[in-house]
Amino acid sequence: MAKAVYVGVDSKARKMKKAYVGIAGKARKVKKMYIGVGGKARLCYSAELERYGMAAALSTTRYDMRAATVGKYALFAGGYISKSSFSYHVSSSVDAYNTSLTKSTPTELSCRRCGHAAASVGGYALFAGGASSYNLLGFYENLVSAVDAYDASLTRSAAHIIGAAVEIGGAAVGNYALFAGGTVYSQINKDNVTSDVLAYDPSLTFTTAP
């Protein structure tokens, strides 16, 4: 049974996204709405999230990936695949899911990445920094300076290179994707972390935040 309510607007049926009722002079959001059918209350509208089901599995089993969105896609990139006797196996795979939950596999990252960061800006999903390997002694190896940018067609390009850094944070605000902190050393500790904040605008122009 459909759990949606439609209203007529300009002779067209429009799906109602939000509903409010007045209580004590205040607008209160309706979470669920029921109608009577055969003497029973039947749900006809719900503003709550519902579990849809399972999407196709990732192309490879892995964990500690980074995720970002671009256009109609959610991208999951890099991360660890498994652990051996000496080190962790790191991935360069990218899996993309569209709004129908159909999976595709764009061009892989320019290198394997762990300890990297992701953020979206304009028409791009960015994956920055990290390292290509991590050993069981707690050391990152082969720190990465490259930034991979994926557009809404899932085409990969190279953004302005940052300094090689690992364990950085990524976030988006307004017209900027920010990458902050981390370390340029193989092993992170309180004495070698940085306070640098790097910013990209929608044209992938790079600047250092003041």
Per-segment meaning from a language model:
Residues 26-28:
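Eukaryotic N-terminal intrinsically disordered, low-complexity segments enriched in Ser/Pro
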